[in-house]
A protein has these predicted regions:
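Conserved phosphate-binding elements of NTP-dependent enzyme cores
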Residues: 1-941
Length: 941
């Protein structure tokens, strides 16, 4: 009999307190609760991990070696579990070669469609290409100058791995003498051994001729032989010049250009046969930029204008680079004390790009003084050469600070060879088709006019493409293009793409586990997402969603509320049942927010701005050359549907432009004309959800700076002074006080061949990171390790008599992080937790009141109660005179904002304009504002 429930017994993973519960199968189930309450521990670290582990167990040990293995979660038993698929937000592919089209496999079908029914054109003149006859080939060769030497080649292997022994033996048996392998000539009488793991290209030399009268007959016979062996292909190798390619398939009669047979790989930018050779299919190149090498052109060279790698000392008169520049001065009559921007264009170009004229460099080294004739290659070419010549990764990283990503000049950012871009369907090449928004792309596919032959070949391919594109549109991604790089997607967008891919797979009997799929989604598009989740459920799957969105909870079949608090105060099942049952449960904080018993209040009055930052002519991505006024001294929410242009405006233009001018950063802002009002600010800070550190050595105590104070405190104890210990003794990052057996990590990594690496506590220090002598130093009976193991709540009580330390810890408590340990490794913190640690750090600083804070969807991962705290914190930042700008979809945050800038009205091409700007009360009166429509009911309550 089929289990109706997933029966979990004795789950103790992380902070779960021996949780036992029954989750109904084949239903839409929401797991909710405060941040850190244990939702993810139950959903991902218990249910998903066990489902994955059981699947892995069914595979051979050989297969498991390649896949890695999931550890058994700390749970007594789980019954009724299906194979589990996790769709979280952390597994976004950051590979620059990965696009929306490739991850959804739509691009694979597009490559097949263009290869089978696309119409090839001449890359030079644009005419449609047809098959070539042998007579046309002979006529083309005879146009070469008289006495030109050439050889006729039969291409028999094109970029394929293997030893190709049979191919070479067959050529030898047929009486041929020579072959060209990977550009090198070999005699077939030799023993030719090829590396089977490398791709090879092999041409048989059919004949060698010289252009003169009367060779047409022999040329025709040789071409026929070459075409026969080369399956319709023949190459003419004009000695020391060009290779002319001939094909019985495609050739331009006017230009004489032949192209290879069109195959799916012709359209792959990840394959050398399709990729643009200059950018190798990336669509961009890295180039040294004069703006980064000479960031402040108001300085002279002697004042340090040039900061490029290898040229930092060019203002030192003892350096060789300075001697070279002095030689330039003598030759071209300028001096090194003039501001760089005051030099004529000609002099600037000579410094940057060099000169072919010889200059005399007078230089005194340890070996004596001399005059050296030098041809100056220019600053940019010099640094380029050094970059190419170095083998050091650290040196390359240093050079790359002065490089900027620029669209490839050869392909215009389209990634493909010109031959691939010359194949069209419906008057569009494959790049133009995939560069449209998915909504326009579906219209293009639906309106394609094909002849009967093309329909017969392409109908099945088009059916697959339509289905997959429709799923993307259904999850609210109608504004994305298939050519969009996945590295530029938000966590929510990446998750919804994977969700669309899963719907396309049509699997049944699976447990899908999702992590806040509503992130980054405007309320308008929530219905589409819910319909998608219900569709997955209706075809016979269990859909378990970790979610805080009110609409999703109200539509769920079953809710599990975990809490009551976070960390040690959480890990229990507080309430289960339908939304109605949760609302009636007195113990459930979630229920109280859903029923309106507790709510985030609308402010009685909105703050008035103290001034404005005026952005004019914003035209980055889809922004339509707009002017936007950002009010200062208050909290502003930038709203709009997904893809409307919020991030382009706030993150790409406002933040990067202000960071460059206020923080002196090297960031490159998006396209805009001017920004006014900068004199009212002194710095800009982006508080995002990126980790506070990349290694376990980074933790909340080190990030907030409170650990420095704690180390000072320990160094001032009687014990420490008696032993001569300084503050550095209590650091686990440097030798002295740390345990040297584990280098202060507290854990040792043991490599297991057929199993995942195992981390075990260090035997010497017992996982305490410090040596015995350091741990013997106590403050109020606690060692430095004991302090790091304290939760924020415990530390607040422990340090209550030391105001400087207590103030910093208090801000961590205020942002809702009472449950995390001071020494909790940064790798164990969620994005939301990392963001709140950054907020706490800012709150603990004594501000100037002239700071502008940028936050992008800070409510990610936050429960209603956490959002309540967040709103209070953001308003506290404004109380000090600071400016807060938040990109947000959460209506509880939007309704508490002093000012709203609504971008839209739609996503992609249909967005990019300011729909409305003003207080929430003013926004609700604007008819075409989707945000106004949804926030209205929140203001009326």
């Amino acid at each position: 009999m089929k289990n109706e429930y997933i029966k979990i017994r004795g789950a103790k993973e992380h902070n779960l307190k021996d949780v036992s519960l029954d989750i109904p199968r084949d239903k839409l189930v929401v797991l909710t609760g405060l941040s850190g309450s244990g939702k993810s521990s139950l959903a991902f670290d218990t249910i998903y991990a066990e489902g994955q582990r059981r699947y892995m167990e069914s595979l051979s040990s050989y297969a498991r070696m390649f896949l890695g293995q999931v550890e058994k979660p700390d749970v007594e038993s789980i019954e009724g579990l299906s194979p589990a698929i996790s769709i979280d937000q952390k597994s976004t592919n950051r590979n620059p070669r990965s696009t929306v089209g490739t991850v959804t496999e739509i691009y694979d079908y597009m490559r097949l469609l263009y290869a089978r029914v696309g119409i090839p054109h001449c890359p030079k003149c644009g005419k449609a290409i047809h098959k070539q006859s042998i007579d046309q080939m002979v006529d083309r060769v005879m146009l070469l100058p008289e006495k030109t030497k050439f050889q006729i080649l039969a291409p028999i292997v094109k970029g394929k791995k293997g030893r190709h022994e049979k191919v070479l033996a067959s050529a030898k048996k047929s009486g041929y003498v020579r072959v060209i392998i990977d550009g090198n000539v070999y005699e077939l009488s030799e023993d030719i051994e090829l590396d089977k793991n490398i791709k090879h290209s092999i041409d048989i030399v059919i004949d060698r001729l010289v252009i003169k009268e009367g060779i047409e007959r022999r040329l025709t016979d040789s071409l026929e032989a070459a075409l026969g062996l080369g399956e319709g292909y023949a190459n003419i190798d004009v000695i020391d010049k060009e290779i002319i390619k001939f094909s019985q398939n495609f050739a331009c009669p006017d230009c004489g250009i032949s192209i290879d047979e069109v195959e799916p790989r012709t359209f792959s930018f990840n394959n050398p046969f399709g990729a643009c050779p200059d950018c190798v299919g990336l669509g961009y190149t890295m180039e040294f930029d004069e703006e980064l090498m000479i960031p402040d052109k108001s300085l002279s060279i002697n004042e340090g204008a040039i900061i490029a790698m290898g040229w930092q000392s060019c203002n030192d008169k003892k350096s060789f680079t300075n001697a070279v520049l002095r030689g330039l001065c003598e030759k071209f009559d300028f001096d090194l004390d003039t501001p760089f921007e005051k030099y004529p264009k000609k002099i600037q170009d000579i410094i940057l790009y060099g000169t072919d004229k010889e200059i005399n460099v007078s230089y005194e080294s340890q070996r004596g003084k001399g005059i050296y004739p030098v041809v100056f290659e220019g600053l940019i070419k010099n640094v380029e050469r050094r970059y190419k010549e170095t083998y050091s990764d650290s040196a390359k990283a240093e050079y790359e600070q002065f490089m900027r990503i620029k669209s490839c000049k050869s392909c215009g950012g389209k990634r493909l060879k010109k031959e691939a871009l010359a194949v069209t369907l419906g008057d569009k090449n494959i790049y133009d088709a995939t560069d449209m928004s998915t909504l326009k792309f579906r219209k293009f596919i639906d309106e394609l006019e094909l002849d009967e032959m093309q329909k017969a070949i392409g109908s099945l391919i088009l059916k697959e493409i339509r289905a997959r594109v429709s799923f993307l549109i259904d999850v609210g991604l109608d504004y994305l293009s298939l050519s969009r790089n996945t590295g530029t997607l938000s966590g929510g967008e990446a998750q919804r793409i994977r969700l669309a891919t899963q719907i396309g797979s049509g699997l049944q009997g699976v447990a899908y586990i999702l992590d806040e799929p509503s992130i980054g989604l405007h309320q308008r598009d929530n219905d589409k997402l819910l319909a998608t989740l219900k569709h997955l459920r209706d075809i016979g799957n269990s859909v378990i969603v970790v979610e805080h969105d009110e609409d999703t909870m109200m539509e769920a079949d079953y809710i599990v509320d975990i809490g009551p608090g976070a960390g040690e105060h959480g890990g229990r099942v507080i309430a289960t049942g339908t939304a109605k049952e949760i609302m009636e449960n007195e113990n459930s904080i979630t229920g109280k927010y859903l029923s309106g018993k507790i709510k985030i209040e609308v402010p009685r009055e909105r703050r008035k701005p103290s001034g404005f930052i005026k952005v004019k002519g914003a035209a980055h991505n889809n922004l339509k050359n707009i002017n936007v006024d950002f009010p200062l001294g208050i909290m502003t929410c930038v709203t709009g549907v997904s893809g409307s242009g919020k991030s382009s405006l706030v993150n790409e233009i406002l933040y990067k432009a202000l960071a460059k001018k206020l923080n002196k950063s090297n960031l490159i802002a998006g396209k805009y004309k001017t920004i006014e009002g900068l004199e009212q600010l002194d710095k800009i800070i982006a508080i995002d959800q990126s980790p506070i550190g990349r290694t376990p050595r980074s933790n909340p105590a080190t990030y907030t700076g409170v650990f420095d104070m704690i180390r000072d405190l320990f160094a001032s104890t009687v014990d420490a002074k008696a032993k001569g210990y300084t503050k550095g003794r209590f650091s686990f990052n440097v030798k002295g006080g740390r345990c040297e057996s584990c280098s202060g990590d507290g854990i040792i990594k043991i490599e297991m061949h057929f199993l995942p690496d195992v981390y075990v506590p260090c035997e010497v220090c017992g996982g305490k990171r410090y040596n015995r002598e350091t741990l013997d130093v106590k403050y109020k009976g606690k060692s430095i390790y004991d302090i790091l193991e304290m939760t924020v709540e415990e530390a607040l009580e422990f340090f209550k008599h030391i105001p400087t330390i207590q103030r910093k810890i208090q801000t961590l408590y205020d942002v809702g992080l009472s449950y995390i340990k001071l020494g909790q490794p940064s790798t164990q913190l969620s994005g939301g937790e990392a963001q709140r640690i950054k907020l706490a750090t800012e709150l603990s600083k004594r501000g100037t009141g002239k700071t502008i804070y940028i936050l992008d969807e800070p409510t990610t991962g936050l429960h209603f109660a956490d959002v309540h705290k967040l709103v209070d914190i953001l308003r506290r930042l404004c109380d000090s005179g600071n400016t807060v700008i938040v990109i947000e979809h959460n209506l509880d945050v939007i309704k508490t904002a002093d000012y709203i800038i609504d971008i839209g009205p739609e996503g992609g091409d249909g967005g990019g304009t300011v729909v409305a700007a003003g207080t929430p009360e003013e926004i609700v009166k604007v008819e075409n504002s989707y945000t106004g429509k949804y926030v209205k009911k929140y203001l009326e309550v």
